[in-house]
A protein has these predicted regions:
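Conserved nucleotide-sugar phosphate-binding/catalytic loop shared by glycosyltransferases and other
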Residues: 4-12, 31-85, 170-172, 236-238
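Hydrophobic acceptor-binding patch used for acceptor engagement in glycosyltransferases
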Residues: 101, 274-275, 282
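Glycosyltransferases and closely related glycan-assembly transferases
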Residues: 85-102, 109-124, 137-142
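Short amphipathic alpha-helix
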Residues: 17-28
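Active-site-proximal region of nucleotide-activated glycan assembly enzymes
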Residues: 34, 55, 117-184
Length: 283
């Protein structure tokens, strides 16, 4: 890869999109390239990206509900407005114009990828899931590269016009901080004794309602042993309801911790003796 490329990345909505994008961005930065992110400031990327030290340009777009087809009109209006703004920014300020654009799926990538296509800027896509999303399928035909995490996805993109030569099986990038997790540091941060058993339960950044319900039903059994500690990540939407349903006493809360999201996943996984999760793009 040429030195000092200016790279724009669009990723957002869930950690399954954002964290693989950050993993790639951190490696690109380590190699001397400049990376700018585009995403929704009010969603997860609006927090995680600046925390990782990357420039962040907020873009407002909305998805649409297939059961309410009239929401498509609003979604298309927001898309056109965001795409137009990006095109104008790239034309007005050469320092913002990227050498390459990378989309990590979800509707947030559409204005950036479409702007790149309009201006003749090469773009690449990354698909984390076993079932490609609508945004990646719609933009697959013009992509210079499509990186996939599941080999079976290749056929789907070929049906949407992508040449087989552009599709590469890469897997999902993992952030260095996850691989560098430290058990002692994680347990100290969670205040879990060395000899205790730590169960970590999470359903991805959005949570998993069924998993949360199951953990609630198991609370008494889990805390019956004095040497068992639990870290339960509920997802933001389920957090308040889960906290109310658990109704933890002060004594119970010392061993059963509830969070909406796990920021320090590397240390948490290293600290855990058992992880209870569900299959997702990254989790």
């Amino acid at each position: 890869m040429a030195a000092n490329l200016n790279i724009a990345i669009a990723a957002g909505g869930t950690a399954g999109h954002v964290n693989p994008a950050l993993a790639l961005a951190e490696e690109l930065r380590r190699r001397g390239h400049t990376v700018r992110f585009y995403g929704e400031s009010r969603r997860l990327e609006g927090t995680l990206v600046p925390e990782a030290g990357f420039d962040f340009t907020p873009v407002h777009v909305t998805g649409f509900d297939r059961e309410r087809p009239w929401t498509l009109i609003t979604a298309l209006m927001h898309l056109a407005r965001a795409e137009g703004r990006i095109v104008r920014d790239f034309k007005r300020d050469p320092s913002l114009r990227p050498d390459v654009v990378i989309g990590f799926g979800a509707y947030i990538e559409l204005p950036l990828v479409r702007a790149a296509a309009k201006l003749g800027i090469p773009y690449a896509l990354h698909e984390q899931n076993s079932v490609p999303g609508l945004a990646n399928k719609q933009t697959a035909k013009g992509a210079a590269l499509i990186a996939i995490a599941q080999p079976s996805v290749s056929e789907v993109f070929e049906k949407h016009g992508a040449p087989a030569s552009a599709i590469k099986f890469t897997g999902n990038p993992v952030r260095a901080s996850v691989l560098a997790g430290d058990r002692a540091r994680g347990r100290a941060a969670l205040d879990v004794p060395d000899g205790a058993t730590l169960l970590v339960a999470f359903g991805g950044s959005l949570g998993a309602h069924h998993l949360n319900e199951r953990l609630i039903s198991l609370k008494r059994d889990l805390l019956a042993r004095d040497d068992v500690y639990v870290l339960h990540s509920t997802g933001a939407d389920d957090y308040d309801d889960t906290v109310r349903a658990l109704a933890l006493t002060t004594e119970e809360a010392a061993r059963y911790r509830v969070r909406p999201y796990i920021d320090d996943m590397g240390d948490v996984l290293a600290a855990a003796d058992l992880v209870l999760s569900r299959a997702g793009a990254s989790s």
